Amino acid sequence: MVPFVRMLALAAALLAAPALGFAADATTVSPKGQKLAQELDSMGVESKWIAGAHIDWETGLPDGRPERMPGRHTHCSAFVAAFAKKLGIYVLRPPEHGQVLLANAQNEWLAGDGAAAGWRPVASALEAQTLANSGVLVLASYHNHRDDKPGHIAIVRPAATTPEAIAAVGPMVIQAGSVNSASIPAKDGFAGHVHAWRDNEIDYYAHEIAGE
């Protein structure tokens, strides 16, 4: 989504969204946040959803089919969709949309139809980390300026940090990508997209986890 249109859509969604409850700050991880972190780590993202492999989107394991996409096709959006499904939460995924350019499509879906599925925009990186620390599922999403080029999406992982660190390098995320990581600052995780961190074009969306 182009930056100006993206800002208008986010502002409208923020005005319409009900408030999410969260802990006081981003410096501590609540018991619910600790549970969320354990569930994220159980996905084994650093050994699954590997770039360049043709995978089953839900398991992250190679499906035996040759990868025909040019370059090293990455699976950030498949990992996010798989984890959300594990929690019983819907985010745009196959078969409603194929894996190719899914991150861009998820960004558009979150800003539009995602509200009806329980997703709410988050105003800042600091709030995104705070929500994750309280046990809320939070996504960090970037739409490429070109519709025919991939965007990126990651999950904000619970982590004890500081407002100063978040301002400098962003919230901590877990992601599949060119390099998969269970814990990496958003600034580094989105480094392959020059506009994402530099131009403040990462969108954050939150969804309460049932039973939490």
Give the location of each predicted region.
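Bacterial N-terminal signal peptides that target proteins for export
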Residues: 1-9
